[in-house]
Amino acid sequence: MSVISMKNLLETGVHFGHQTRKWNPKMAPYVFTARNGIHIIDLQKTVQKAKEAYDALKKLTSEGKKVLFVGTKKQARGAIEREALHSNMFFINNRWPGGLLTNWNTVKKSIARLKKLEAMEADNSFEKEVKTKKEVLTLRRELEKLRKTLGGIKDMATIPEIMFVIDPKKEEIAVKEARKLGLKIFAVVDTNCDPELIDYPIPGNDDAIRAISLFLETMSNAVIEGTGGVVEQPRFSEDLDSEALALEYQGEYDESGKFIMDEDADSKKSKAEEPVIPTAEEPAITTIEVDQNE
């Protein structure tokens, strides 16, 4: 039994990969076709790999293993934090602190500093620690910086056994550290990623907000089920990615999170508006009908 329906995958744009000129050939087994300069991901493979990842994550967490959710791109930050907290696990959703895993003893000192500053804030003792308003302001800025970077792992006593990543290409440093230490790595891999670096790759769009939410909510459920909690239905429809959907994902997200149409996408856009005649072997993605009861 699948853990994500084909209907939900289509609705959230999971099948839209990157432009063909940006692909990683190692993703070939997961590509269905190319259409208007964009690779279309084989959703049958996504269903299969999502099920494998779900079952493995459920089993590992049932054994008491902990998960670190990682996703620092703007469109992933909210869902990363929400689903990590929902499953009572840990997260990094801003900048990855280099050496977080490989230099853990140093990172623990920074976490201890964060907790000390939070305790000082709670009992209003900043003024007792320093003498001037400028020094108080410096402490508060230090607190906010540490909270932003390490807030999602401040209760992480040891290095976790599992990492779940959105966009392992962007989070390549995190993936390298995890591989070096032997963590089990789960990740959503778009057509520009190297799936061979991941223990449990799930082929899919790692840029669309709703696709990211669908994957994270589903895998959060695997953790909750593994730890004996109550599983909820994915709530991905609460997130909307209408701008990218209107442009048929023919572009990239910039650092501010705005979806920008690619420089050569205008001509592709006009071609995309032409009707696509499906064949028996290759149904048009834009005309797939899905059983509403699936």
Curated annotation (Swiss-Prot):
GO terms for cellular component: cytosolic small ribosomal subunit. Signal peptide: none annotated. GO terms for biological process: translation. The gene is rpsB. Residues 261-274 have a biased composition (Basic and acidic residues). One of its GO terms (molecular function) is structural constituent of ribosome. InterPro entries: Ribosomal_uS2, Ribosomal_uS2_bac/mit/plastid, Ribosomal_uS2_CS, Ribosomal_uS2_flav_dom_sf. Residues 261-294 are annotated as: Disordered. It comes from Leptospira borgpetersenii serovar Hardjo-bovis (strain JB197). Belongs to the universal ribosomal protein uS2 family. Keywords: Ribonucleoprotein, Ribosomal protein. This is Small ribosomal subunit protein uS2.
